Amino acid sequence: TILMPPTDIPGVGRFAMIADPQGVPCYVMRGAVDAVSTAFAPDTPGHCQWNELATADQQAALAFYGGRFGWQPGDAVDMGELGDYRFLVQRGTTIGAVMNAPPGGPPPTWTFYFGVPDIDRAAQAIVSGGGTVHHGPAQVPGGSRIVVASDPQGASFGLVAPPATG
């Protein structure tokens, strides 16, 4: 479903807002120049490092995003009653994951995780800036540490940092 038609931003590119078949909204964009985007940079603080979709129908979401963007399902982690946490792979790079939305939880949505050097400091900055930390800081498989939060206006986001040292 097209929620906002394709729109040009001079010198930047063209974007639109869509909703997938489960109703989850997201923006899609093509840059003004034919180059690989640097918005997703798994090892660079301040950039998106993980894209996580909680959806009502994991298989339909995998088919939709795979068919539109070429994302391939990768390995999976068994999450018990929630099913698989299925990794998304684009050109050999794991860019995120798709999971079933928990029953009774928030509605299906994308959560984008941005890199920070220190998750504890980042969590403190969220709270002192008027935001809310909903989950974390918590360690995830692989050792990275995350928080899931919202800003003072209620927009949700995630942060991810390297494993704590010391």
Regions found by a protein language model. Give the residues of each.
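Vicinal oxygen chelate
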Residues: 1-22, 57-59, 90-91, 113-156
